[in-house]
Design a protein with these regions (language model features):
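A cross-kingdom feature that marks ATP-driven nucleic-acid transaction machinery
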Residues: 98, 104, 109-268
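Interdomain motor-coupling "hinge/lid" segment immediately C-terminal to the ATP-binding subdomain
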Residues: 1-79, 103-104
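Short amphipathic alpha-helical interaction segments
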Residues: 87-101
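Alpha-helical residues within the helix-turn-helix
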Residues: 83
Length: 268
């Protein structure tokens, strides 16, 4: 049996970062992280993948990983993944299952609650470790990460991974969803809490936030309140990167707390 074990969380070590992720060996020797990730991928492909499935073409599977990294944070489209690799959609489905079984990816399903809206019903996919995602995308330095068109989706994936690790490490169920409707309203993450509460999270890979960034959460909160008990709280967090100068206030919009991602994890 394959043990589903996630990398270290930011609660477990402050060394966890967007660029390096949470694998202990990559964090222990940052200068050698690139070599370690390359070795890890080779070991993972030759040992773990073969242990759970009869993948015959490891080279194509390796290309699949890189392609999946380029779709990090997007709605999962198996046909879109199958075509450039020249494999079938059932093969992609099997490979996705392998990655999920071995805790290499997170599949974030759409929020299920009926809010009177026509919802996008496809899940989103993230690599479980941001360091591995950066490696697969060829991002090896903070400067490259800052300029990368993937910076936003990588940051979003880091938050997804940290939320799931916090839930699992606390002995709870993994419950993380995304929200997107056909009118274009989108909130990065939604998860239920105690006493029927709901937490909405919007992720921004920026150091300065604005009230407009919180608007989608406020719209979803208003829709949720019409369908939920009045006493059920709806918590909203605008999660961002650490500013150069610490902000004096967390309040960015009515009912919304703007927190750095590390502060958000403490407040969860």
């Amino acid at each position: 049996a394959v043990l589903q074990l996630y990398p270290l969380s930011a609660r477990e070590t402050p060394k966890v970062s967007l660029l390096r992720g949470g694998y202990p060996d990559a964090l222990a020797r940052p200068a050698g992280a690139r070599l370690w990730f390359a070795s890890y991928l080779q070991t993972y492909l030759e040992r773990d993948v073969r242990a759970v499935t009869a993948v015959k073409d490891l080279a194509t599977f390796r290309r699949f990983l890189a392609l999946l990294a380029s779709r990090h944070g997007q709605v999962l489209n198996r046909t879109d993944l199958a075509a450039p690799l020249g494999v079938s959609v059932p093969t992609i489905t099997q490979w996705i299952s392998v990655l999920e079984t071995t805790a290499q990816i997170l599949i974030v399903p759409p929020f299920y609650e009926n809010l009177g809206k026509r919802l996008i019903k496809s899940p989103k996919v993230y690599l479980a470790d941001s360091g591995l995602a950066c490696h697969l995308l060829g991002i090896d330095s903070a400067a490259e990460l800052a300029k990368s068109p993937f910076a936003g989706s990588l940051f979003e994936g880091l938050i997804a991974s940290e939320i799931v690790k916090a839930q699992v490490n606390a002995g709870g169920r993994r419950e993380l969803y995304h929200f997107r409707d056909e009118q274009g309203l989108e909130v990065d993450f939604v998860f239920p809490g105690r006493n029927g509460s709901l937490t909405l999270v919007e992720c921004k890979a920026v150091r300065t936030v604005t009230p407009a960034m919180a608007a989608p959460m406020q719209r979803l909160r208003d829709a949720a309140r019409k369908q939920r008990p009045k006493e059920a709280a709806v918590n909203m967090f605008l999660v961002h990167q650490a500013p150069m100068v610490k902000s004096r206030t967390e309040a960015v919009a009515p009912g919304v707390r703007a927190l750095t991602w590390r502060d958000f994890l403490e407040a969860m």
